[in-house]
């Protein structure tokens, strides 16, 4: 049973009438451009064919009723005429409430709705299940009430909800790619202007995501430390962000910087350049160059930004040994565990999977999870 069939059936069962509208919003994976977003730099994600689906209908009053199919059909209900407060015990509810609250501030011209939500974006794998939910909820009200908000505004609304209502300090990439993704394309995003450029993916290439299933522990504290080190670097150059520093400027005075800060800055500057070049390589179908850039990105995250772990490095090594120069592989996400992303010719996917299954657990004691994805369409009707 598809997610849409599941939410549609549950809607009729719980609310006693059929849903009128079905909305999906995808998760995402970032192909290259790591820790560049908060430095006003570039990222190159694609939406994936794992998504949040919502079956919904307008109500005649100002109440919002929600059923979460993936949480034992837990329910939430709140009014648009009363202050929307955080839910004490249901964290999933706060993503819905936060999006609706911030949507009201943008465009108060909408009424109540009934929603049934389900998703298959793996949680805790760094594939943006939360952004997918936020964008899906925003898109529900945009469609039901014909709100004059575009995809970028729906994305910004989701980011605001996560930062200010849920209390998680995320960048804009995850929501933007979920809202604006394009089938068979990646999206080059300028995190300063929020400008986007669709980049065609080569035919016959699979997006493979492998979760190391290594339990991340340092990610929060170390993430904040990396941000502070980048800000220190930007201040040294008297710039608003590292986006504004050239590699030549850096190389001329790198010896004057604290050695650790210098390594962090070098990663961001080289990663920005790699990301822009990667978009060009992908558009030209040059998988060999894309693979080189992904390898350089991984080495930079390992040696200069120091955010990889041995389990992740092992996965990258195993995949690279199979694909050689026919594709690329690197860690993706914040670091200290999580996933690797690989661009793999479809014919080689079984061989990659077999190699990972044979070697990863034997070398690390952890069983991986393997996903084969297609670059998919952003949020909309389904």
UniProtKB/Swiss-Prot annotation:
PROSITE patterns linked to this entry: GALACTOKINASE, GHMP_KINASES_ATP
GO-annotated biological processes: galactose metabolic process
Please name the Gene3D superfamilies in this protein's record.
Answer: 3.30.230.10, GHMP kinase, C-terminal domain
The record ties this protein, via SUPFAM superfamilies, to:
GHMP Kinase, C-terminal domain (SSF55060), Ribosomal protein S5 domain 2-like (SSF54211)
Q: Where is this site: Transition state stabilizer?
A: 28
Annotated keywords: ATP-binding, Carbohydrate metabolism, Cytoplasm, Galactose metabolism, Kinase, Magnesium, Metal-binding, Nucleotide-binding, Transferase
**UniProt keyword ATP-binding, yes or no:** yes
Where does it live in the cell? Answer: Cytoplasm
Q: In which pathway does it act?
A: Carbohydrate metabolism; galactose metabolism
PANTHER family xrefs: GALACTOKINASE-RELATED (PTHR10457:SF7), MEVALONATE KINASE/GALACTOKINASE (PTHR10457)
Q: What is this protein called?
A: Galactokinase
What species is given as this protein's source? Cronobacter sakazakii (strain ATCC BAA-894)
Question: What taxonomic lineage is listed for the species of origin?
Answer: Bacteria, Pseudomonadati, Pseudomonadota, Gammaproteobacteria, Enterobacterales
Gene name linked to the record: galK
